[in-house]
Structure formats: C-alpha cells, structure tokens
C-alpha cells in the first residue's frame, strides 16, 4: 500500500515543494502490515515528530472507508478542531490520488461537513467523523475503527480509551498514536497496563 505511489502529503515546512509523494520507507511498510493484520485489531504506536505517522494512519483509514460499505470511522483528538485537521489530511490524500492510479469517476464521491467534522462517502453509507476526547463521546455508537491521535496528552485519555470497548466490540479496530510520554499510553505500548 505504502509503496504504490498513490499517497501524497502536504509538508508545510517546505514551501518550495509542499506536496510530496509518501516516502517508500521500510518502517512505514512494517507499520502498515501490523495495522492490516493486527488481531485483536488494536495498534498503539509511539511516534516522534515528522515521521509521517498521522499521515499514514489517516491514509489507512481512508482506504478502509473507500472500499467498505457501511463503515463508521471516528478520528478522536484532544479537541474537535484537531480531529478536523486529521479529516483535512484525509481529504487532501483523497484529492491527490493520481488519475493513473484511480480515475476520478472510479473514486467514491465524498461530501465534507465542517460541523461536526465529517466526511461522508456518498452511496457507501460510510463516514469518517471527528470527535473530541472524552469517555462519553462515542458511547452511543458502534465503530468500524477509531483513531486516537496524540492520546498520551489528553486530560481524559485513559478514560476515553477504556470507553472504546463497547463501541468496537465484535471486531472494530482501534489505533492509538502519540508522541512518547509516560503514563497510560506508555503502559499500553509496552504491555504494562493494569
């Protein structure tokens, strides 16, 4: 998937060449393989800045949405505007899929909503929706997948993570990424959960 050359990112630091093809790096292939084959479908990834992890998991969730009818995917961040930024990445990746890889007519059509932040895949009954942290944010929903971004720094990170079990029970995928920080996320990454 990573090596296919269909993913483009936006690098706001490089103003001369801000649109870049996703790099074909071995560690990104390994993370992709782990994500695709995780059983149970829980992946926790400690990251450092500028390793493209947020872009990678945004792409993986976009791929999940584009090719699965009825998927309900949630991007959870500390605040709703931050989850909307992740949806901006998804939309950017979608808008920059090369015609040679998939002609526009073959792509599922999308509709973007700003409040609440959501991308709807028209005709597929599939959505990616942005939500803020909090144990009750997804309580009434069932989810195909939940992405928790920078979760180690949330005030209610552990509670938000703990509340996902009924939301994803039965096979829903949970992806937790964050810059390294001691606490519940560190314990999750290194199997030290109580």
Residue ranges and their predicted role:
Residues 1-194:
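Phosphate/NTP-binding elements of NTP-utilizing enzymes
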């Amino acid at each position: 998937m990573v090596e296919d050359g269909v993913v483009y990112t936006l690098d706001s630091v490089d103003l001369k060449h801000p649109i870049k093809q996703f790099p074909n790096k071995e560690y990104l292939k390994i993370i992709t393989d782990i994500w695709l084959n995780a059983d149970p479908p829980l992946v926790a990834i400690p990251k450092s800045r500028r390793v493209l992890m947020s872009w990678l998991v945004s792409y993986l969730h976009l791929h999940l949405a584009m090719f699965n009818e009825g998927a309900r995917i949630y991007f959870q961040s500390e605040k709703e505007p931050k989850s909307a930024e992740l949806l901006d990445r998804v939309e950017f990746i979608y808008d920059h899929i090369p015609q040679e890889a998939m002609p526009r007519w073959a792509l599922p059509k999308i509709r973007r909503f700003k409040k609440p932040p959501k991308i709807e895949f028209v005709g597929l009954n599939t959505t990616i929706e942005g939500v803020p942290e909090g144990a009750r944010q997804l309580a009434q929903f069932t989810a195909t997948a939940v992405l928790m971004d920078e979760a180690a720094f949330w005030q209610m990170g552990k509670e938000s993570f703990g509340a996902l079990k009924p939301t994803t029970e039965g096979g829903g995928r949970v992806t937790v990424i964050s810059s390294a920080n001691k606490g519940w996320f560190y314990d999750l990454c290194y199997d030290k959960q109580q």
